[in-house]
From Swiss-Prot:
Signal peptide: none annotated. This is Large ribosomal subunit protein uL15. Belongs to the universal ribosomal protein uL15 family. HAMAP family: Ribosomal_uL15. The gene is rplO. Binds to the 23S rRNA.
Amino acid sequence: MRLNDVKPQKGSKKRRRRVGRGISAGQGASAGLGMRGQKSRSGSGTRPGFEGGQQPLYRRIPKLKGFPVVNRKIYTTINVEKLADLPANTEVTLESLRAAGILTAAKGPLKILGNGDLGVALNVKAAAFTGQARSKIEAAGGSCEVLG
């Protein structure tokens, strides 16, 4: 076998069909574009989103106000009522809550929310507290420490 014997695989070099070159050529007259209408004209087709003259969807729906916050901080949140099961004077952190099985997945820094009641004094260390959560923890005799 020599280099001049190498030929492409049979059927791999299919010639493109030349359309619109007379009726006897097979694809003459309308060149596979059907009868009349917008899709058979030159420069054919409609723009994306065109719905045949009906008001398109992107113009029917309202423009929404505002914009998304780019670097939004995602917190792992927990309510004060979940902390009520812990023993008194426990130091509460994200790691200790995961070890205790109260939290299963941590998406980010810990934030304490104020839903429910707390009757136990706890030393809570978290990235953020709501006002209600802070007042309930301190009313129970505990302390709140914001981690930076």
